[in-house]
Amino acid sequence: MKLKYFGTDGVRGVANQDLSPELAFRVGRAGGYVLTRHSERKQPQVLVARDTRISGEMLENALIAGLLSVGIEVLRLGVVTTPGVAYLVRAQEADAGVMITASHNPIKYNGIKYFGGNGFKLSDELEYEIEQLLDAEEDTLPRPSDAGLGTVADYHEGALKYTSFLEQTVSSDLEGLKVVVDAANGATSGFISNLFADMNVDFIPINDQPDGLNTNLNCGSTHPESLQKAVVENNADLGVAFDGDGDRCIAVDNEGNIVDGDKIMYICGKYMDKKGLLKKDTVVTTVMSNLGMYKALEAHNLKSVKTKVGDRYVVEEMLKNGYNLGGEQSGHIIFLDHNTTGDGMLTALQLLSVVKDSGKTLAELANDVTTYPQELLNIKVADKTTAMENQKLKEIIAQVEKEMNGDGRVLVRPSGTEPLLRIMAEAATPELVHEYVERIGDVARAELEVE
């Protein structure tokens, strides 16, 4: 079931070009209609939110017009994080939620992401139904002119409700911690003051003045350099950085070192296990997590399960097998006991709570994980679908793995989106890892490279 409009994260594109207001209207209209067919209510209720990028209001208004045209009751949340929408859909018992964001991508992009009433991404089946309507030659959906049209109301209490929910996910306040908070000039900007003040944190906000054009710009979880500097200059205990829509969190320890998603999962997983809260003693990760994290988990008798790259696959695995902690190196971390998607502010509170409760510094807690040097090589290939069947490629991979003898790993896989073969290796030293990647790369070039 290949979808034309919906990618792994909803409908994405360059705002006002690929993702035009006209398309947003149609996505609202088609999505709204599909919901009316599956809802028990006479008038389905949908929550709509956006991040801080300048195109958000244009797309929000177009999308809402589409929803109203097929009779949906819309509650407009304004600027709220993606996980905020996922939580509020469930708390409000709405039929769906829609988030307008392109997450960590550059400002010219935007996207439309639907959540079902359960707070998870819409099912593939429902997305397929919406696609069928978007692709139809003519729009035959109902067009009421009076009774049967939808209504819209601002729902500012939503943000307060979400903040109170976050606060009750940790058992005590966080007094005594000094923390720098980087809001990426994104959707968390309006939340951090209330949240961290309520938790009695001595906090220093940075990059919390969105102007519509500065979301993620040299700041936030994808550019933590300004956070590293601020933590050291302010002699803070640690720093946390979110991304544009608030579904990621990366930390910086008291010495100014980056503590990525792998290390955060390890620290929180070990703590949850000690408290008897980690289901099946297991952390769910993607294949891109660092070998150092797996070794640290093993040293504490904790298990891990690997999925394909993408937080949706992590969530699928967690739901299927009853795990409650998982995530990605990039900082999408899912605490399934609390929320249905990666949640940056929730992750930050859990991490701060562990730091306070342990009495250790973040640097000490992260020290258990020795990050192995990692190198990634992309090679353009003629046919990525058959690349992995090449005998010589299989042989060199097996040879390298034998030489590593458990102190390193190789991951060779076709790109999900481009005609590339991705060769990733981790080993004890940068020199070794470079040698391994190049040896596999040489064979791939000779056997598979585009002429």
Swiss-Prot record:
Domain of life according to the entry: Bacteria
Cofactor binding, per record: Binds 1 Mg(2+) ion per subunit.
PTM statement from Swiss-Prot or TrEMBL: Activated by phosphorylation.
Catalytic residues identified in the record: S103 (phosphoserine intermediate)
GO molecular function annotation: magnesium ion binding; phosphoglucosamine mutase activity; phosphomannomutase activity
Catalysed conversion reaction: alpha-D-glucosamine 1-phosphate = D-glucosamine 6-phosphate
This protein's record includes keyword Metal-binding: yes
PROSITE patterns (alphabetical): PGM_PMM (PS00710)
Gene Ontology biological process: carbohydrate metabolic process; peptidoglycan biosynthetic process; UDP-N-acetylglucosamine biosynthetic process
GO cellular component, as recorded: cytosol
Ranges in a coiled coil: none
Residues bearing PTM Phosphoserine: S103
Entry function: Catalyzes the conversion of glucosamine-6-phosphate to glucosamine-1-phosphate.
Family, as annotated: Belongs to the phosphohexose mutase family.
PANTHER family referenced in this protein's UniProt entry, alphabetically: PHOSPHOGLUCOMUTASE (ALPHA-D-GLUCOSE-1,6-BISPHOSPHATE-DEPENDENT), PHOSPHOHEXOSE MUTASE
Protein name, per record: Phosphoglucosamine mutase
Organism whose genome encodes this protein: Limosilactobacillus reuteri (strain DSM 20016) (Lactobacillus reuteri)
